[in-house]
């Protein structure tokens, strides 16, 4: 079967295995959960596909001040102490699931590969 009819034909055997494991997992789909249940399920499974975290020159938790006097939590990742280009990262999750913590390894990886600073915004 061609990949035009079956996009999974292009996947590596390792990715096929990951998808099979996900399909067998005894979890309800996210849309069937309350927001609180979805957050807990996401947090519990966030590390399953994690890549080993890169060691970076800077990893720093920030509190970014905003107009109303409150702050927005964020985390800065940088492979060097020199001035660098900046990527602002907003994790997915529909404003319901995900956090700076669940995307820590990914942001470290992005910073390392792109040789730029990454600010991951927590919301």
Per-region residue spans from a language model:
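Fold-independent oxyanion-binding glycine-rich loops
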Residues: 74, 121-123
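Active-site donor-binding loop signature of nucleotide-sugar glycosyltransferases
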Residues: 66, 92, 123
């Amino acid at each position: 079967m061609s990949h035009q009819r079956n996009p999974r034909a292009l996947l590596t055997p390792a990715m096929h295995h990951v998808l099979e494991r996900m399909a067998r997992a005894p979890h309800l789909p996210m849309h069937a959960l309350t927001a609180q249940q979805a957050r807990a399920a996401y947090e519990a499974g966030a590390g399953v596909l994690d890549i080993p975290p890169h060691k970076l020159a800077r990893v720093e938790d920030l509190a970014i001040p905003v107009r109303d006097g409150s702050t927005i939590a964020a985390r800065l990742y940088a492979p060097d102490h020199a001035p660098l280009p900046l990527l602002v990262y907003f994790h997915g999750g529909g404003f319901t699931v995900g956090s700076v913590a669940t995307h820590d390894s990914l942001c470290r990886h992005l910073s390392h590969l792109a040789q730029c600073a990454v600010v991951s915004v927590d919301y």
